[in-house]
Design a protein with these regions (language model features):
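Charged/polar positions on well-ordered alpha helices
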Residues: 8-11, 66, 97, 114, ...
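Substrate-binding/gating loop at the entrance of the active-site cleft, primarily
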Residues: 1-31
């Protein structure tokens, strides 16, 4: 179970996407089916922590290590969620979060966060974020401002969106608790329907 943005991020850069079926109990990637989908062209595994429910990351990381693959966690819906005490998005090589208006924490529209858990990706991510220029070298006086070294775009959040997001991050526990209370209200109200087999 996923959303098109996850696949698009790779397909738009020429990657061939191979989907792996889900576990019906979590709606997340079925870790027992990953190995069968790996080919000699596979570069990465992209677990999607749907609705903040963690994928089976121990198994996924073992498979990635065995086949020398990268793991990019789609934690778009998993801010403040964890797996065995580790925050989601911090386990794989990279972790991606979304602040789209439909998420628990929003920047009043679009926006996101990339966690870089592997130093090999830090410089490339910075260059991509800065329209393909190496700003850290520019600020050290080593290159001019308009020396393009790679492809990129302007992935910098505007000040108003950043301020809006910051205000929510300061109250993230309260926001998450309110949402959990709403979830519990629905769960308690609907569980009798499950008991009487009106829903599964």
């Amino acid at each position: 179970y996923t959303f098109v943005s996850t696949a698009n991020a790779f397909a738009l850069r020429g990657a061939k996407i191979i989907f792996v079926d889900i576990r019906p109990d979590t709606m997340n990637i079925d870790e027992t089916k990953i190995e069968a989908a790996i080919t000699n062209k596979t570069k990465a595994i992209i677990p999607v922590h749907y609705a903040g429910v963690a994928c089976e990351m121990d198994t996924i990381m073992k498979i990635a290590s065995k086949y020398n693959l990268f793991v990019v966690e789609d934690a778009a819906q998993a801010i403040m969620s964890s797996y065995k005490g580790n925050p989601l998005g911090t386990i794989g090589h990279l972790g991606a979060f979304s602040f789209h208006e439909t998420k628990n924490i929003t920047s009043a529209g679009e926006g996101g966060l990339l966690l870089i858990n592997d130093e090999r990706f830090a410089e490339r991510a910075e260059i991509t974020r800065e329209k393909g220029t190496n700003r850290s070298l520019f600020f050290r006086g080593m290159v001019d401002k308009y020396s393009w070294v790679d492809i990129g775009s302007s992935y910098l959040m505007n000040d108003v969106s950043a301020a809006y997001l910051w205000g929510q991050l300061e109250k993230i526990d309260e926001i998450q608790n309110n949402r959990l209370n709403s979830w519990n209200l629905y769960y308690e109200g609907l569980k009798n329907l499950e008991k009487h087999r009106y829903i599964e």
